Amino acid sequence: SNERLKWESENDCNKIFEEWILDNKLSSKKKIENIRKEISNYVKEEKKLAWELYQRPIKEAKDDLISVFSKLEGLDVDIKKIFSTIDDTNISDIVKLCRRFIYDLPANDKKNKEILNNWKKKYSDILSDKYSSNLYSIDISKLSEKFILPNYLNDSDEVDGRIIIRDNFDKLLESNSRIFIFGEDVGVIGDVNQGLEGLQEKHGKERVFDTGIREATIVGQGIGMAMRGLRPIAEIQYLDYILYALQILSDDLATLTYRTLGGQKAPLIVRTRGHRLEGIWHSGSPLGGMLSFLRGIFILTPRNMTQAAGFYNSLLNLDQPAIVIEPLNGYRTKEKLPTNLGKFKTPIGKVEILKTGNDITLVSYGSTLNIVYEAAKKLKDYSIDCEVIDVQSLIPFDLEKDIVKSIIKTNRLVIVDEDVPGGGSSYILQELLKKQDIYQYLDSEPTLLTAKDHRPPYGSDGDYISKPSVEDVFEKVYSVMYESDPRKFKEI
């Protein structure tokens, strides 16, 4: 409104500040006017320079393409006419022109096509490096972090999985003063599954501490600490609660390195727990959404607490944000206690073959691996030899392309996932089809076995009917083998 505009003019902060300077005789009207003119001239010159710097690579690209056009053999190119068809204010406009020119070249004009395709690749790479790089803090295609296996004594104790996580965190806190662990119920009670039992008392309230229940603020604290050189481990109590922090994880953490062209990093580790247990708010596995929204963050899905501990050890040697999803039903499951806690490292971006086989490849991750492994053992009794592969790292995914090596051997694939249909399993299949080119090696249709569309209701019956069971896996695998050889396998 006019009234509001008048108020803005009368209360303009620069105007009031100038009046304050004059009233307090800190400067004169003439000096202020001179400063204003100097600033105005400076801004105009810098604006002009900025525009020239922006235009320079565009002009270079245009001149380069004109030079290429002039050297094409057997073609009389009207350069002025060609460039009149585009608004060459961006490099992409010039790349676009080149690509469209290639479309109209004769099919047998291979030499000119090669020249233009080389030019197109050069400038497409320039654009990619400028606008489509640094999504991750490290080059995941060259992720070469050497892993260290957990060591065991011949008579190593079998302990609850929570003990392995707890004692591993204890070693990490002892060895690195920059590590802080915090979240809801993390401090006094040592987290809801006792994976941090006694660590606040031992290492102090400043190192292991409780927060409020707002997941967004927990992540926000972690981002700020990580950007300042600390190594925070921020706990989101259950994977289901990640939704409350999804915006800040997606907009702030996942994009930080990308939007600053690698200039800033926040190697925050988000610790959470999920997958199957019993309860509608504590059995979530929304990996499909996370994989879509959180590109830029590693998403790691260990099947047990030893693998989880190894992931923390590996991540603390990288400047890369990550989410580690501990399996909820693993805290009371017995595992051997490693002797090199705090030092062994689970490889990131590498699958693990849990059982070799020749007939069919079963791929899964997290808590469902136990179900798949049990089903594979039972299928052996029915003359079906399954190869069981633990993905364990969804982002990055199977960097060494070991899954396709298995499929070349078995020619069949079943992906088992406790996310909803179209979720994590579809991501895995897309990775395998697009990046590992498995289609040519399949003799049967790739099969997906997922949870139901709804959240799992409370109770064992609800869990059984909502998420893949041993029987579900058995029947799905058996149906693939029956379809491939109905004479060998009877119908069930």
Regions from the language model: what does each represent?
Residues S1-P321, I325, L328-I492, ...:
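Thiamine diphosphate
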